[in-house]
């Protein structure tokens, strides 16, 4: 790994990104390089540097000190770049096949240089196009199971876990989730964003005391339960995929939180894609939900039985209790994410990309009804087949 002297923060340009790649020695001397800024996210600059002869490339990602979606009036910590690079390295120690390689990071410049995954496609885009990604849910189920187990009190020494958790204290980005996922959509807040035609539907949510109580319970879990190292923002836009490969990216929201959170986020985004499809094309999404949970429980359970360091792990019923609570939490977190992505600050192309306005509004009303029931009825769901049942029951 190359080492260069850090300097004071300044935003990169394509020219500076190219110079950095050369200084790091990641390409042969004299290689003709092409650099393009490709970032389309809200929080970062992303540059793709490619050797024009071999077509081999790297990605240079730099955190911005503000959210692009809002501007400099919304300052953000640059520490999230360190969180991201450390999370990728931590995940790589357990599931290297599911994350990009990190070549270099610079804390003061808020830069991470990593493997080029441009030969893959962002899963959200592919799902919108109708791709099925047959191994996506198997890979994500394994990713979540292994990263959760090995960073939990069951998979690592408890004192070492506490030290690791300290290195992933991430208050600024957790605050974004606390507000945009668990709070703002349930109240009349300026950050919310929805069509005028949905106002009556949204007001119903704002005045729903039962929904508020259950959302508050889920927010409390997010705030207080430091179970495992989470990706923190595991939606289909944070995953590169092909028919046989899956890579998880962008863990700048990583922190120690409740086991079910990443599961719920991923499931929610599968549901959001299903909401955008006609009935005849939804089955692959529900199959993915089934497999995600099945693989997660299988892998997590096997690790529990064979590698747990917790004395109580052999106690009959404890694993079942952990898995049951994880499922209930995942259902509730999925409901919060579905509602947030429908009426909150950051929408998804799955719903917003529906061309016919009437169909788009119908899908969003469906999303609000589904999200509500996932939250308030989460403890009543017995398994992933109940996602199908609630989906159908809330369609009209």
Curated annotation (Swiss-Prot):
Substrate binds at residues 233, 340. The lineage of its organism: Bacteria, Bacillati, Bacillota, Bacilli, Bacillales. Belongs to the methylthioribose kinase family. ATP binds at residues 44, 61, 115-117, 250-252. Gene3D superfamilies: 3.90.1200.10, Phosphorylase Kinase, domain 1. GO terms for molecular function: ATP binding; S-methyl-5-thioribose kinase activity. This is Methylthioribose kinase. It is an enzyme of class 2 (transferase). The keyword Transferase applies. Pathway: Amino-acid biosynthesis; L-methionine biosynthesis via salvage pathway; S-methyl-5-thio-alpha-D-ribose 1-phosphate from S-methyl-5'-thioadenosine (hydrolase route): step 2/2. Pfam families: APH. Homodimer. Catalyzes the phosphorylation of methylthioribose into methylthioribose-1-phosphate. Keywords: Amino-acid biosynthesis, ATP-binding, Kinase, Methionine biosynthesis, Nucleotide-binding, Transferase. SUPFAM superfamilies: Protein kinase-like (PK-like). NCBIfam families: MTRK. It catalyses: 5-(methylsulfanyl)-D-ribose + ATP = 5-(methylsulfanyl)-alpha-D-ribose 1-phosphate + ADP + H(+).
């Amino acid at each position: 790994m190359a080492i260069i002297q850090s300097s004071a923060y300044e935003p990169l340009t394509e020219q500076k990104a190219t110079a950095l790649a050369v200084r790091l020695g990641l390409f042969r001397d004299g290689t003709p390089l092409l650099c393009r800024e490709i970032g389309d996210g809200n929080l970062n600059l992303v540059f793709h540097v490619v050797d024009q002869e071999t077509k081999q490339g790297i990605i240079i990602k730099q955190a911005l000190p503000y959210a692009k979606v809002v501007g400099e009036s919304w300052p953000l910590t640059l520490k999230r770049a360190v969180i991201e690079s450390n999370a990728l390295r931590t995940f790589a120690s357990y599931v290297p096949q599911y994350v990009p390689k990190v070549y270099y990071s610079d804390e003061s410049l808020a830069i991470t240089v990593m493997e080029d995954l441009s030969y893959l496609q962002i899963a959200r885009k592919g799902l919108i196009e109708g791709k099925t990604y047959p191994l996506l849910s198997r890979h994500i189920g394994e990713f979540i199971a292994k990263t959760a187990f090995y960073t939990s009190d069951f998979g690592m020494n408890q004192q070492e876990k506490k030290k690791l958790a300290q290195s992933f204290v991430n208050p600024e980005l957790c605050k974004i989730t606390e507000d945009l996922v668990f709070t703002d959509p349930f109240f009349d807040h300026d950050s919310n964003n929805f069509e005028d035609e949905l106002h009556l539907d949204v007001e119903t949510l704002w005045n729903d005391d039962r929904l508020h109580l259950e959302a508050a319970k889920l927010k409390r879990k997010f705030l207080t339960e430091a179970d495992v190292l989470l990706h923190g923002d595991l939606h289909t836009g944070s995953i590169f995929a092909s028919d046989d490969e899956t890579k998880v990216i962008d863990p700048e929201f990583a922190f120690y939180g409740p086991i079910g959170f990443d599961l719920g986020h991923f499931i929610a985004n599968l549901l959001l894609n299903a909401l955008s499809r006609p009935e005849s094309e939804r089955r692959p999404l529900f199959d993915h939900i089934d497999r995600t949970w099945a693989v997660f429980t299988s892998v997590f359970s096997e690790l529990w039985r064979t590698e747990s360091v917790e004395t109580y792990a052999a106690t009959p019923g404890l694993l079942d209790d952990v898995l049951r609570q994880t499922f209930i939490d995942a259902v509730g977190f999925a409901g919060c994410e579905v509602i947030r992505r429908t009426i909150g600050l950051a929408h998804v192309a799955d719903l917003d990309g529906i061309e016919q306005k009437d169909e788009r509004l119908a899908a969003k009303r469906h999303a609000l009804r589904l999200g509500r029931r996932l939250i308030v009825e989460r403890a009543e769901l017995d398994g992933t087949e109940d996602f199908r049942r609630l989906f159908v029951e809330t369609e009209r």
